[in-house]
UniProtKB/Swiss-Prot annotation:
PROSITE patterns to which the protein is assigned, alphabetical: SBP_BACTERIAL_5
Gene3D superfamilies xrefs: Dipeptide-binding Protein, Domain 1, Dipeptide-binding Protein, Domain 3, Periplasmic binding protein-like II
Subcellular location: Cell membrane
PANTHER family, A to Z: PERIPLASMIC BINDING COMPONENT OF ABC TRANSPORTER (PTHR30290), PERIPLASMIC OLIGOPEPTIDE-BINDING PROTEIN-RELATED (PTHR30290:SF10)
Membrane association type: Lipid-anchor
Source organism of this protein record: Haemophilus influenzae (strain ATCC 51907 / DSM 11121 / KW20 / Rd)
One protein family per Pfam: SBP_bac_5
Signal peptide (UniProt feature, chain positions): 1-23
Lipid linkage positions (N-palmitoyl cysteine): 24
Protein name per Swiss-Prot or TrEMBL: Putative binding protein HI_0213
CC terms in the record's Gene Ontology section: ATP-binding cassette (ABC) transporter complex; outer membrane-bounded periplasmic space
């Protein structure tokens, strides 16, 4: 919308469910306003639209490789832009790269925008990305491991100092063409490139801070970073706020002076929950002679109400599927009647031969609460004998490694927004497959999804893979994590998305004239 303040249209556009609808009817015979009052009012309105205030609880960093929290990444994404990024709905979109192509999902060609520039006016080149990632590989940052995680060719050997940094699969064919070579087919590479660790770094020595995002650093103090618009940003005409202030605050701080705060500590109003790409679940021991039967797992899952497990716990989304809801598409779970006792009976489980279940979990408060409620729901059946066993995190990992459990607390978070990040846990050749699940059809579909360059075929395979996980009841899903975000009602442009990203460049303020 070019005229962002022309809101008095009778349209069906919904900006956000938390925003108040303001009546747009014209007033009859408006009273004249003195020029002095009019000028004062307009000055105040324009001032409100100029600056965005964001509160943060952690120390901020200007180095993407040093990011340790979501708060820190928000500042970095305002200052820098990678090859790809996200829109307000969490969809992947071109950023510095205007397009990309591949013929085998292993060798990728990215074409950079001709008008992509640093904040000093210099063009951003393919060599900038090559140098940035090479430097990352030689740093002490744990984020350098992301290069190997994204399957960048020779990354593992380079990180281990077995090969020189020039061996990384990165090539600047010319200023605007970047070739990326991978060790194995990865159709989701563009999604992985939106990660904060891959943001470019200005390599030349300079007295001022140089960035390439929608904003540039104007000044910084101990607890404050002031950003102003980057005059050379390729989409500068879409940036509304001229200034963004990041202010470090205490846990007891009054948030009324701020527009956006992630993970607010003591506020319950004006909160939006942004679902994370993280799921909380219990693993079945698939080597257990009874639990290796899918019918038994199905019976157990059917006894659980995830809504009741997390009903009074804030910022958790009950989830009946292993994958985050944003990855399900139209494949939402369908309820079907299940008689658990009948399935148990068919598998020689009875009151005289009950199934003994040990629920193992690390003894944090949330985990204890979930385990207690889980025990209560399962204990409704006379065919089950349920025992809770809380332990330390390290003891839990030891039990998992030894297979010493029936049900064990688990979870998984993805670094990129693609179903493969979760489905990979059940691919038999994956190092992330810890439960020993092996299914030839699952492996075939997964490998086909990785190698095909047809998005249609890949999505069809993903749907089939999701179906197998669901039908086999490979895990007992509980909930999906979310990040609470404080947003004042006047801030527009923010939409709940699955990647938890709120770019300041996408926001604007609705100010009602008085």
């Amino acid at each position: 919308m070019n005229n962002l303040f022309a809101l008095c249209q009778r349209s069906a556009v919904i900006f956000s469910i938390i925003f108040t609808v303001v009546a747009c009817d014209k007033l009859d015979s408006p009273k004249p306003i003195s020029p002095q009052i009019e000028t004062q009012k307009n000055t105040q309105l324009e001032s409100n639209r100029v600056e965005l205030k964001r509160g943060v609880y952690s120390d901020l960093t200007l180095q993407p490789w040093q990011a340790q929290s979501e708060e820190q990444t928000q500042l970095l994404r305002d200052l820098f832009e990678g090859l790809t990024a996200y829109d307000v709905q969490g969809n992947l979109v071109p950023a510095v790269a205007e397009n990309w192509q591949t013929e085998d999902n292993k060798t990728w060609i990215f074409t950079l925008r001709e008008n992509a520039k640093w904040s000093n006016g210099e063009p951003i080149t393919a060599s900038d990305f090559v140098q940035s990632w090479q430097t990352l590989s030689q740093s002490e940052s744990p984020l350098k491991n992301y290069l190997a995680f994204m399957n960048l060719k020779n990354a593992k050997a380079v990180l281990e100092k077995a090969l020189p940094v020039e061996s990384l699969g990165l090539f600047a064919e010319n200023d605007r063409t970047l070739r990326i070579e991978l060790d194995k087919a990865s159709p989701y590479l563009p999604s992985m490139l939106a990660h904060v660790s891959l943001l470019p770094h200005y390599a030349k020595s300079t007295e001022i801070f140089i960035s390439n995002g929608a904003y540039q650093l104007q000044r910084q103090a101990e607890n404050q970073h002031i950003l102003t618009t980057n005059p050379y940003y390729w989409a500068k005409e879409k940036v509304i706020f001229q200034q963004v202030k990041y202010q470090k605050i205490s846990v007891d701080a009054d948030l009324s002076d701020f527009d956006v705060v992630m993970n607010p500590k003591k506020v319950n109003q004006n909160i939006q929950d942004y679902p994370q790409l993280c799921t909380y679940f219990y693993e079945f021991n698939l080597s257990d002679p009874v639990l290796q039967k899918s019918a038994v797992r199905k019976a157990i899952v059917s006894m659980i109400s995830t809504n009741n497990l997390v009903a009074d716990i804030a910022h958790l989304y009950p989830n009946n599927t292993f994958l985050p809801k944003s990855m399900l598409g139209e494949q939402e779970s369908v309820w079907e009647p299940v008689v658990a006792e009948q399935l148990f009976s068919q598998n020689q489980i009875s009151e005289t031969r009950p199934l003994k279940l040990r629920i193992r979990y690390d003894d944090l408060s949330l985990n204890q609460t979930i385990a207690m409620r889980l025990n209560h729901q399962l204990s409704q059946s006379d065919l089950l004998r349920v025992e809770n066993q809380g332990m330390s995190w390290q003891e839990l990992q030891t039990a998992r490694t030894k297979g010493d459990f029936q049900l064990i607390r688990s979870g998984w978070c993805a670094d990129f927004n693609d179903p493969a990040a979760f489905l990979n846990l059940f691919y038999s050749k994956s190092p992330d497959n810890k439960n020993g699940y092996k299914n030839a059809e699952f492996d075939r579909l997964f490998e086909s999804a990785m190698t095909t360059i047809s998005e249609k075929v890949r999505l069809e395979n993903y749907a089939k893979l999701k179906g197998i996980v669901q039908q086999e009841h490979l895990v007992l899903p509980i909930f999906q994590y979310s990040t609470p975000v404080y947003l004042v009602p006047s801030i527009m442009g923010a939409q709940v998305n699955s990647v938890g990203v709120i770019y300041s460049k996408d926001l604007w303020r609705k100010v009602q004239s008085q």
